[in-house]
């Protein structure tokens, strides 16, 4: 992997992400649209060791009969704080972890990262449409 010039800060590996912090609550409302937002997400760029800070938007329908417990979600996000993970990987990881927890195909995760080096990055995974007919897992 290429290395950044200058000072590089230490960071943790992906195994420090605490998926076990996530908790789901039983919920009977499959057609209710749920949107969760936080401006407090941060991880570490594995190239430079500098912080990547962003706004996370989670949208979903609780088709699996579950909703995410918000305090557990906050603790899960905090576990990313010292993890070296690329922006695109972080979005994919959050999407996959929540999709597995909530057992829904109608989920979308968007992360809008703070501008760094004059570049604004937005990453997104998922869809609120769910699976299309004939789609293979």
Curated annotation (Swiss-Prot):
Protein family according to the UniProt entry: Belongs to the GTP cyclohydrolase I family. QueF type 1 subfamily.
InterPro entries hit by this protein: GTP-CH-I_C/QueF, NADPH_dep_7-cyano-7-deazaG_red, QueF, QueF_type1
Catalytic reactions on record: 7-aminomethyl-7-carbaguanine + 2 NADP(+) = 7-cyano-7-deazaguanine + 2 NADPH + 3 H(+)
Protein name in UniProt: NADPH-dependent 7-cyano-7-deazaguanine reductase
Pathway: tRNA modification; tRNA-queuosine biosynthesis
The EC number(s) this enzyme carries: 1.7.1.13
Protein purpose: Catalyzes the NADPH-dependent reduction of 7-cyano-7-deazaguanine (preQ0) to 7-aminomethyl-7-deazaguanine (preQ1).
Major localization listed first in the record, in broad terms: cytoplasm
